[in-house]
């Protein structure tokens, strides 16, 4: 997973609240067996509207989504994070996230930055007045900078550390590979193993 420190990208104002995971990626796309290639599924129903924000310049090149409250509610879908990331988003800003979505985001390398609704509305106003406005998201300082305005955001320390280190669940496990190997060596041979014992050909 790519480490996250500072990201600069075009802000996209999504003035919708209670955006659930079925709106982020409809269930029909969950039948795919690949891990990537979900960018076409992101907000699929809404993108059929030519006036939807992601169908307009310069927002179709945005990488920082500024959404309404209660983003990512509904069923738990890692695919929701994958679709946002595959489209190009590195950050989602909202005043409230569903707990499961926030957890999936951190594991998938997507920053879910929580800030006050007043600050979200300030960003909406600035972005709409200056289409193409680039936001600078600094995970080290937990700030979002828009022009001369610097706004704080919240993220728990553990998820912040994982993103800064670029560690997904597999990466976390591999950091302990030496300890795991030593444990396996010291494990009594009479105990069950994950690999079958070799069969003698005699």
Swiss-Prot record:
Q: Give the pathway.
A: Amino-acid biosynthesis; L-leucine biosynthesis; L-leucine from 3-methyl-2-oxobutanoate: step 2/4
Biological process according to GO: L-leucine biosynthetic process
Q: Kindly list the GO molecular function terms attached to this UniProt entry.
A: 3-isopropylmalate dehydratase activity
CDD domains per the record?
A: IPMI_Swivel (cd01577)
Catalytic activity, as annotated:
(2R,3S)-3-isopropylmalate = (2S)-2-isopropylmalate
Top-rank taxon, per record: Bacteria
List the Gene3D superfamilies hit by this protein, alphabetically. Aconitase, domain 4 (3.20.19.10)
Record keywords, A-Z: Amino-acid biosynthesis, Branched-chain amino acid biosynthesis, Leucine biosynthesis, Lyase
- For this protein, the Enzyme Commission number is 4.2.1.33
Entry's Gene Ontology cellular component terms: 3-isopropylmalate dehydratase complex
Role: Catalyzes the isomerization between 2-isopropylmalate and 3-isopropylmalate, via the formation of 2-isopropylmaleate.
Sorted alphabetically, which NCBIfam families does this protein's record hold?
leuD, PRK01641.1
Q: How does it assemble?
A: Heterodimer of LeuC and LeuD.
PANTHER family given in the database record: 3-ISOPROPYLMALATE DEHYDRATASE SMALL SUBUNIT, 3-ISOPROPYLMALATE DEHYDRATASE SMALL SUBUNIT 2-RELATED-RELATED
Instruction: Cite the HAMAP family for this sequence.
Output: LeuD_type1
The family classification in the record reads: Belongs to the LeuD family. LeuD type 1 subfamily.
Q: What is this protein called?
A: 3-isopropylmalate dehydratase small subunit
Q: Name the gene that codes for it.
A: leuD
């Amino acid at each position: 997973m790519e480490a996250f420190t500072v990201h600069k990208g075009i802000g996209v104002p999504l003035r919708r609240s209670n955006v659930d995971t079925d709106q982020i990626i409809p269930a029909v796309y969950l039948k795919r067996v690949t891990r990537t290639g979900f960018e076409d599924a992101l907000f699929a129903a809404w993108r059929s509207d030519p006036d939807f924000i992601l169908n307009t310049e310069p927002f179709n090149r945005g990488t920082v989504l500024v959404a309404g409250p209660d983003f990512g509610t509904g069923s738990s879908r890692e695919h929701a994070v994958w679709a946002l990331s595959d489209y190009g988003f590195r950050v989602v800003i909202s005043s409230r996230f569903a707990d499961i979505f926030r957890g999936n985001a951190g594991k998938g390398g997507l920053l879910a930055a929580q800030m006050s609704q007043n600050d979200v509305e300030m960003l909406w106003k600035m972005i709409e007045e200056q289409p193409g406005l680039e936001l600078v998201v600094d995970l080290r300082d937990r700030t979002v900078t828009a022009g001369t305005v610097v706004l704080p955001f919240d993220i728990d320390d553990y998820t912040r550390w994982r993103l800064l280190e670029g560690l997904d669940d597999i990466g976390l496990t591999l950091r302990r590979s030496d300890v795991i190997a030593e444990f396996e060596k010291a494990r009594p041979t009479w105990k069950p193993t994950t690999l079958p014992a070799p069969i003698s050909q005699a």
